[in-house]
Amino acid sequence: MSVFAPIARELDIFFGFSWRDWSTTIIPGSIFAVGAMRDLPPATLVKNYLFLVTWLTPYIYFFNLSNQITGVDEDKINKPDRPIPSGKVTLQGAQRRWIAAFSTFLGIALYQPEFLPETLCWIATVAFLCLTSYGDHWFGKNCVAMTTGTWALLSASWKAIAPATPTSDAWVYAVSVWAGLITHIQDLRDMEGDKAVGRKTLPLVFGDMGSRLIITFFALPAACWVLSLAGIFQLAPVTLGALHAILGYRVLRQGGPRYDHKTYMFYTYIFCLILAFCALDGLGLKINAESLRALLATTGVSLKEL
């Protein structure tokens, strides 16, 4: 057996646990971090970004393992291809990997104490989601946990590259609240599994159509308003307004779980695009198709994907 075979297997397992969440973690964190790279020497830029990747990897892996270890019954219904329900990894194997991911994540913060607030915030958020009943309620699951988790992600992503600024902090807070307001979209596609495990998500509490009306006519306008408070919406008002309108239209369509999954993915692309606009402004660049394409190319994302 090749010495690289165990490494390849672990990478494959990591991908199996985490790939669904890259567009809300590793990719947006990397995009936002680009905005902090202005005037940095190339060697410093590369070193700091590699450190960020080192932090982001256990950030997402620790969460995915925690979520999927405690959510096997739900995954058997909603996502049977995941490593545990598919039999690719045993529950005990996932638990061993959880210990490694958690130890690595916390160890990085102890080595670089300036990341301790974001690290502890994320650990507390994951515990809240996976170990308490409040993490199964629509308000706790999205309004609270998505807000705090996004803050940890974006704050650390910027700080890994350069010190935070008042502007970057305003962006982080605004985008975090934006995410907490409209991530209920993810629950429109998973109602069967959520009902089976006793979750109280927005669609299960207010009904399918009721939740869609709340998201479209309350959460989306409120989210746009929050972005405007930090000056983000003003960076590309026509584009962001149109994208949120399209998102609202898709939410109201009731096209079934597969359609709702695509709507959720569309939401994650808007998330990445918002951070790309912030990054371009942080670099002092004019926002246009060419500058956006160049920025996204540094993170492996194309305009077609967005």
Swiss-Prot record:
Location(s) in or outside the cell: Membrane
Stored Gene3D superfamilies: UbiA prenyltransferase
Cofactor: Mg(2+)
Residue stretches spanning the membrane: 13-33, 43-63, 115-135, 161-181, 213-233, 265-285
Organism, as annotated: Hericium erinaceus
EC number assigned by the record: 4.2.3.206
Modulation of this protein's activity: EDTA completely blocks the reaction.
Broad enzyme group: lyase
Lineage: Eukaryota, Fungi, Dikarya, Basidiomycota, Agaricomycotina
Name of the protein in question: Diterpene cyclase eriG
GO cellular component: membrane
Keywords: Glycoprotein, Lyase, Membrane, Transferase, Transmembrane, Transmembrane helix
